[in-house]
Amino acid sequence: MDNFLSLTLTGETPRVTQGKGADFRWRWLGHGLLELTPNAPVDRALILSAGIHGNETAPVEMLDKLLSALYIGSLSLTWRVLVVFGNPQALAAGKRYCNSDMNRMFGRRWQSFAESDETRRARELELSLETFFSYEQARIRWHLDLHTAIRGSHHLRFGILPQRDRPWDTDFLAWLGAAGLEALVFHQAPGGTFTHFSTEHFGALSCTLELGKALPFGQNDLAQFSVTSQALSALLSGLETSTSSSPPLRYRVVSQITRHSDNFALYMDAQTLNFTAFTKGTLLAEEGDKRVTVTHDVEYVLFPNPAVACGLRAGLMLERLP
C-alpha cells in the first residue's frame, strides 16, 4: 500500500486491500482509512489523523512520508495504528470543507447539520474509531489529530487538548513538548472535535496539533515540520524522544465568542495573530445590546474569525496557566 494518499485523493479502490509490511500487516478499510498491526503483540493503539480540513495538506504529506518509511522497513512499528485522512473530497478539491466544518460534527453532532458528504464522513469516522478501539483492549490509547492554521500565531506550533475529567498523563504532555509544540491549550467544556470524541468515548489521550500555515499540496516545506516528524517516527518505533528544554506554555479556555446574527462585530482584523494578548476591559465584540469584554487581567485570543456563519464560534479567549 504505497499509494494510500493518491487513492484517497482520486477516490479509487485498491486492487489489493490487505498485505504485509516489514514487521506489520496492513488493511485498507475504506477511502482515507488504513490500519497497521505489528506482527508482535502490542498493548498500544494510536490514531493518526490529518486532513479533517481539506486545505491543511502538510500533515497529510508528513504522514504519507512516515507510511513510506514503514513500508520499506526503515521505520519499525510498535503500535496498532489507524491512519485517517479525514475529508478526502475536500482534500481533492483543495478546500477547507465542501459543505460544513466536519470538526464541529463529532459526538453525533452531525445530526444537527444538513445531510452532506461531511456528515456521512463524520459518522463513518466515528464508527471506524469504535471498531478500531473495540478490536483489542489496548492499555494505552492515543489520538494525534494533525492540522495547520489559517492565520499566523505567536506560537508557531501548539496543541489543543479536549475537556477531560481525569488528569492528563505526564508522558503524553512531555511527548507533545518533544514534538515541538510551544503551547498547550486546555478546553474546559465538551465540543464537536474529532479529539474530543476519541477522549470522551474511548478514553484516548488526544490532542489537536496545529503545526504551521495551511498551504496547498506541493507547496509545503516539510523541513519546517521536521521536529514533529522525528517525534512521530520515534513514537511509532517505541524510542525515547528527547524532552524539550523549554516545556510548552499552558493556557486554558475561559470563554467562547459566538456569532448569533448578522449584527455581530468582532474587533479583530485578519492580521490579528493567534495568542494576541488583550487587557482587562478591552471590548472584543458586540452584537446588538451585548458587549463582550476581557474579564481577566490578560486574555489571549485563539482562532478569531469574524466571518463565521451564525451560530458558530468566532474565537476563543484564553488565560495563561502558571
From Swiss-Prot:
InterPro entries per the UniProt record, alphabetical: AspA/AstE_fam, AstE_AspA_cat, Aste_AspA_hybrid_dom, SuccinylGlu_desuccinylase
Cofactor(s) demanded: Zn(2+)
Matching SUPFAM superfamilies: Zn-dependent exopeptidases
Enzyme nomenclature, EC number: 3.5.1.96
Reaction equation(s) it catalyzes: N-succinyl-L-glutamate + H2O = L-glutamate + succinate
Binding site for Zn(2+): 53, 56, 147
Cofactor-binding details, from the entry: Binds 1 zinc ion per subunit.
A GO term, aspect molecular function: zinc ion binding
Keywords, alphabetical: Arginine metabolism, Hydrolase, Metal-binding, Zinc
Any single biological process term in GO: arginine catabolic process to glutamate
Pfam families: AstE_AspA_cat, AstE_AspA_hybrid
Coiled-coil ranges per UniProt: none
Pathway terms, separated by semicolons: Amino-acid degradation; L-arginine degradation via AST pathway; L-glutamate and succinate from L-arginine: step 5/5
Domain of life, per lineage: Bacteria
Function of the protein: Transforms N(2)-succinylglutamate into succinate and glutamate.
Family: Belongs to the AspA/AstE family. Succinylglutamate desuccinylase subfamily.
Protein name (database record): Succinylglutamate desuccinylase
Gene: astE
